[in-house]
Amino acid sequence: SSDVCSSDLVRGWLEVKGWAYKDFGTNSAASVDYPDYAHPLALAVESGECYPGIAICGSGNGINMTLNKHQGIRAALCWNAEIAHLARQHNDANILVMPGRFISTEEADMILTEFFSTQFEGGRHQNRIDKIPVK
């Protein structure tokens, strides 16, 4: 429906900002397997081809879990602007995941704005991030 977050909304938001982006799909209403889209996105962010990444899924959980299987990825499931702010400020999230079925277009706009305008704080948060990879 028109009141939920969609990839069209995100593409439009990025275009209004004048930012280049790479669209990994999906571009249809057909049911798809989220790992088929999560892995290429994660690889692009890990390699530096894209930064940051944005993913939208029904609840956001499945694609978020898949993205976070990649060592260099810190995907954050954000359903409001405050969560998006903290994901960037404290966790240096490099992929924003939004639960498309559960947020409105207005909420998505606020989340995107907050995620892209917040800088990583570093300091004690960097020490914690350094402990994330399994060694």
Question: Model segments located where?
Answer:
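Short, structured active-site "lid" loops
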Residues: Y37-S59
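Short, glycine-/small-residue-rich phosphate/pyrophosphate-handling segment
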Residues: A81-N127
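A short beta-strand-loop structural module common to alpha/beta enzyme folds
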Residues: W19-S31
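Mid-chain, well-packed structural core segment of small domains
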Residues: A55-R101
